[in-house]
Amino acid sequence: MNINLTLFGQTLAFAIFVWFCMKLVWPPITAAMAARQKKIAEGLDAAGRAQQDLKLAQDKVSHTLRETKEQAAQIIEQANKHANAIIEEAKQQARVEGERLVAGARAEIEQEVNRARDQLRSQVAALAVAGAEKILESQVDAKVHNELVEKLASQL
């Protein structure tokens, strides 16, 4: 066999093989590569969007958390103010109640003192009558004597 003819035949066979591959094998491979390339590009775009969404969500969460902490601090501050107001009101009520009890006790003490004074006056009057009876050795009218003692006690 002639080497030129063999080379020519192999070149022709190779050309037919290349044409066959270009017509039947190459289009599905390029289509699959294009589809895969498109899918990878979409995946990268989705990953980029997901990162942006994640960053936005993290910013939103941190903003919401900050607002929530501020609201909690305000609520705690209001609760403390309210508690202090209740404590002050209770103290004021306790002061008023204490003053009322002290005033009542003072009034009661004053009544007892007046009652004791009246009892002492009547006892002094009785002693004065008894002393006067002994001095005069006669009985003095108790009504007249009580009037004299009342005048004397009112002057004291």
From Swiss-Prot:
A Pfam family assignment: ATP-synt_B
Topology of this chain in the membrane: Single-pass membrane protein
Transmembrane parts of this sequence: 12-32
Places the protein is found: Cell inner membrane
UniProt KW Cell inner membrane keyword: yes
UniProt keyword Cell inner membrane, yes or no: yes
CC terms in the record's Gene Ontology section: plasma membrane; proton-transporting ATP synthase complex
GO molecular function: proton-transporting ATP synthase activity, rotational mechanism; proton-transporting ATPase activity, rotational mechanism
Main location: membrane
Entry keyword set: ATP synthesis, Cell inner membrane, Cell membrane, CF(0), Hydrogen ion transport, Ion transport, Membrane, Transmembrane, Transmembrane helix, Transport
HAMAP family, per the entry: ATP_synth_b_bprime
UniProt-listed NCBIfam families: ATP_synt_b, PRK05759.1-2
Family statement: Belongs to the ATPase B chain family.
Subunit structure: F-type ATPases have 2 components, F(1) - the catalytic core - and F(0) - the membrane proton channel. F(1) has five subunits: alpha(3), beta(3), gamma(1), delta(1), epsilon(1). F(0) has three main subunits: a(1), b(2) and c(10-14). The alpha and beta chains form an alternating ring which encloses part of the gamma chain. F(1) is attached to F(0) by a central stalk formed by the gamma and epsilon chains, while a peripheral stalk is formed by the delta and b chains.
Role noted for this protein: F(1)F(0) ATP synthase produces ATP from ADP in the presence of a proton or sodium gradient. F-type ATPases consist of two structural domains, F(1) containing the extramembraneous catalytic core and F(0) containing the membrane proton channel, linked together by a central stalk and a peripheral stalk. During catalysis, ATP synthesis in the catalytic domain of F(1) is coupled via a rotary mechanism of the central stalk subunits to proton translocation.
Name this protein carries in UniProt: ATP synthase subunit b
Gene giving rise to this polypeptide: atpF
